């Protein structure tokens, strides 16, 4: 994907609010200042947070919701030479540019902005928020009471609830609460799109950086959807790192991974305490990386939620498991090591692995693992099925 060189992207956690002071009139090809301003915002509600009085250098200010024009290729955007154009947190491709430099201010480094001329500004040291759990019925009743108020103003939570509901689509209207209060219930409208949810969560997490104490919050969404939103935010963080940002020390809880750990505890008899994950990793660290083997127990854990048929052709457990090594370029699968982002199997008819699939070689490798690794039994070795590292 390409991006026109006239677009200048600024990424900052401070851009949950619009940076009025960073908007300047641009010059046309004749070096004349263009004093007509067009600001594109991501949602209709965001139009309320653009203060036209804070643009004294412009004769006219227009604020529009940014919508994707499918008839225009973002690689060749429409040129509006009669206006200075600014984008705030765009969620769709940019299809219009103005005179001079078109500036983009965003808290999210999206796929559409990644290939643009990008600058990461204002490295923050946030106070990491803490997510907790809460009964679903109480959350739904509190969110329903809030969302009935069309203006998004704060309403008292139910008597039995100690949560403070927040309308996530309009976080700036809750800025004082998000900074001074705590125990937040993050509510979304049913019709809110995924991209707006991602942007809303990012804005709220950015606002949490201005707190003196870590924020505590719970999200009124299905666990699968929360995991998906967190994954998208983690990918955005990766894009930032690729552009030179600093790593974040804040982490989020992935429900699927947490369920996996709980199942491992039950299967292996690991006690539930602060070092559970550490002990789980140590238990298999001496076999996974040195010998490139995937423990059978990990394969079983990944089959707990699989619908395995009793039919002979479907009774085989799901074995396409990859264990990724941190800060390394390889992954370990049930059939050997493979470069990350490469297929499990080499192209057909390019590798004859008969030398590795015979009983003699398998017994030799098994004996080496048992002897060198200090194991007494219980080791199952399968031959490699590709030749990336042979």
UniProtKB/Swiss-Prot annotation:
It is found in: Host cytoplasm; Host nucleus. Its main location: host cell. This is Protein AC109. Coiled coil: none annotated. Plays a role in the transport of the budded virion (BV) to the host nucleus and for occlusion of viral progeny. Keywords: Host cytoplasm, Host nucleus. One of its GO terms (cellular component) is host cell.
């Amino acid at each position: 994907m390409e991006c026109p060189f006239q677009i200048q992207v600024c990424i900052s956690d401070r851009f949950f609010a619009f940076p009025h002071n960073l908007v300047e009139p641009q010059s046309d090809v004749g070096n004349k200042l263009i004093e007509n301003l067009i600001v594109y915002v991501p949602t209709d509600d965001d139009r309320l947070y653009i203060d036209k009085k804070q643009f004294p250098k412009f004769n006219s200010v227009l604020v529009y919701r940014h919508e994707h024009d499918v008839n225009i290729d973002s690689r060749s955007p429409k040129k509006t030479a009669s206006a200075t154009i600014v984008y705030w947190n765009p969620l769709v491709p940019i299809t219009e540019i103005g005179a001079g430099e078109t500036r983009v201010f965003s808290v999210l480094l999206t796929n559409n902005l990644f290939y643009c001329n990008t600058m990461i500004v204002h490295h923050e040291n946030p106070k990491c928020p803490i997510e907790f759990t809460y009964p679903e019925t109480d959350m739904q009743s509190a969110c329903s009471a809030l969302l009935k108020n069309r203006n998004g103003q704060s309403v008292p939570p139910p008597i039995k609830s100690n949560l403070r509901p927040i309308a996530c689509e309009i976080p700036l209207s809750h800025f004082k609460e998000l900074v001074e209060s705590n125990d937040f219930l993050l509510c979304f409208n049913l019709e809110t799109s995924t991209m707006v949810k991602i942007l809303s969560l990012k804005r709220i997490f950015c606002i949490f950086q201005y707190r003196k104490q870590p924020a505590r919050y719970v999200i009124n969404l299905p666990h699968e959807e929360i995991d998906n939103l967190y994954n998208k935010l983690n990918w955005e963080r990766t894009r930032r790192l690729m552009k030179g940002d600093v790593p974040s020390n804040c982490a989020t809880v992935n429900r699927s991974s947490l369920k996996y750990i709980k199942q491992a505890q039950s299967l292996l008899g690991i006690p539930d305490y602060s070092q559970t994950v550490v002990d789980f990793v140590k238990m298999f660290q001496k076999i996974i990386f040195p010998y490139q083997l995937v423990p059978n127990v990990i394969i079983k854990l990944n089959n707990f939620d699989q619908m395995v048929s009793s039919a002979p052709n479907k009774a085989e457990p799901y074995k396409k498991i990859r264990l990724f090594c941190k800060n390394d370029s390889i992954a370990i699968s049930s059939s050997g090591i493979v470069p990350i982002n490469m297929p499990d199997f080499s192209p057909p008819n390019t590798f004859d692995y008969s030398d590795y699939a015979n009983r003699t070689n398998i017994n030799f490798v098994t004996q080496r693992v048992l002897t060198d690794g200090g194991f007494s039994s219980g080791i199952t070795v399968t031959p490699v099925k590709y030749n990336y590292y042979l």
